[in-house]
């Protein structure tokens, strides 16, 4: 840990030097980014204003297809979704890289935090935190919105694999073509999502799905009657 701490201190000192006296354009960009990030007074003054465009997109969601498009648009800003995606070597064919699809969408560390009694205090603190964030974002009745969002997230967690299952190299290796992926979540149009995210079709032409049953469970939650909860969750 000493090496990690020392390395982070060195990186910080380099960044601070860039902020104080940048010698070239790239160093100035680094310094400006750091200075902007550390300007807490300006951040507090701005409030939720920088999020206004994204919040408007979420407010406008009126159907599952609309939510799919919005999730794709937000993906370009690295906004987390209920599906995780990354590119990595193919365990079955290390000579190539392939897209991996994984379960996602939880604010707490893993699914056990939503069901085990030992985490009740953490769940209550999490609910209070979500309420505070929604209030700061100007959401009407943030307590009710937080309840809906966390109730939905708890349902999402019920379909997550536990940590032991996620470490199983064989169970989490499920190569699929795009058509097979689509069959797991018929309500989630991957083509609509990829177009909005500006992801090339080839990226999802063939994938490895880590937790297939999670996607089939997710499908049961992609319903019109849960749209209000999805909007609250996305905020």
Specify the residue positions occupied by each region the protein language model found.
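N-terminal mature-domain "stem" immediately C-terminal to a signal peptide or N-terminal signal-anchor/transmembrane
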Residues: 1-15, 167
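Noncatalytic, helix-rich "gating/capping" subdomain that lines the substrate-entry/channel surface
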Residues: 15-235
């Amino acid at each position: 840990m000493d090496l990690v701490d020392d390395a982070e201190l060195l990186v910080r000192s380099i960044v601070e030097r860039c902020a104080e006296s940048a010698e070239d354009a790239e160093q100035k960009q680094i310094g400006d980014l750091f200075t902007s990030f550390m300007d807490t007074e300006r951040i507090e003054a701005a409030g939720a204003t920088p999020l206004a465009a994204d919040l408007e997109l979420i407010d406008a969601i009126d159907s599952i297809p609309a939510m799919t498009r919005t999730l794709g648009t937000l993906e370009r800003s690295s906004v987390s979704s209920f599906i995780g995606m990354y590119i990595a070597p193919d365990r079955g064919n290390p000579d190539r890289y392939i897209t991996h699809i994984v379960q996602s969408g939880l604010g707490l560390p893993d699914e056990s935090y939503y069901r085990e009694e030992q985490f009740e205090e953490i769940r209550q603190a999490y609910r209070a935190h979500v309420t505070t964030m929604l209030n700061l974002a100007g959401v009407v009745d943030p307590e009710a919105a937080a309840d809906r969002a966390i109730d939905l997230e708890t349902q999402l967690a019920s379909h997550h694999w536990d940590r032991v299952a996620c470490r199983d190299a064989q169970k989490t290796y499920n190569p699929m073509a795009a058509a097979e992926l689509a069959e797991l979540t018929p309500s989630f149009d991957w083509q609509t999502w990829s177009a909005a995210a500006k992801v090339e079709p080839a990226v999802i032409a063939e994938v490895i799905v880590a937790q297939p049953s999670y996607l089939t469970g997710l499908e049961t939650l992609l319903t019109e009657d849960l749209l209000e909860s999805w909007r609250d969750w996305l905020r």
